[in-house]
Amino acid sequence: MGIAKEFREFAVKGNVIDLAVGVIIGGAFGKIVDSLVNDVIMPIVGLVFGRLDFSNLFLVLGSVPPGTPATLDALRKAGVPVLAHGSFITVAVNFLILAFIIFMMVKQINRLKRAAPPAPPATPAAPPEDIVLLREIRDSLRR
C-alpha cells in the first residue's frame, strides 16, 4: 500500500476530522473568551480595584534609559526587564473562565450520557444448523 493511500485513509477517518473541527472551534472559542476577559471582566475588576487597565500593571526590574516612556510596550522595546504581573492576571482570569466553561460542558455531557436509556441486552444469535445437529447427536448418544 502506498504512502499516499495510507495517508488519505488516515486523514479521512472520523477521529482526525473531529479533532480538526475541535481545534478550529477551540481557537475561535478562545478568542471569544479573550474578548470577554479583556473587554468585559477586566474593566469591571479594574474599576472595583481602582485601576482601569490591568495590562499596564508592571514592575520595572532594571534601569530605564532616559527618554523612554513609562509604558510596558516602550520599556520592553527598550530592553528593560519588567515583571508584567497585570498581563499574568489577565491570562490567569482567561484560563479560569475557559476551564470553568469546559468543566460545565463536560459535566453536562456526562449528565446526558447517564440520562440516556441503556441499550437492551443483545440476544444471542441462533447457533448454526450443523452445531444444532451435532448437539442432537451428542444428546442421543448419551441416552
Curated annotation (Swiss-Prot):
Compartments, record wording: Cell inner membrane
Main localisation: membrane
Transmembrane segments: 10-30, 40-60, 86-106
Pfam families to which the protein is assigned, alphabetical: MscL
Taxonomic superkingdom: Bacteria
Record text on subunit structure and interactions: Homopentamer.
Name of the featured protein: Large-conductance mechanosensitive channel
Organism: Paracidovorax citrulli (strain AAC00-1)
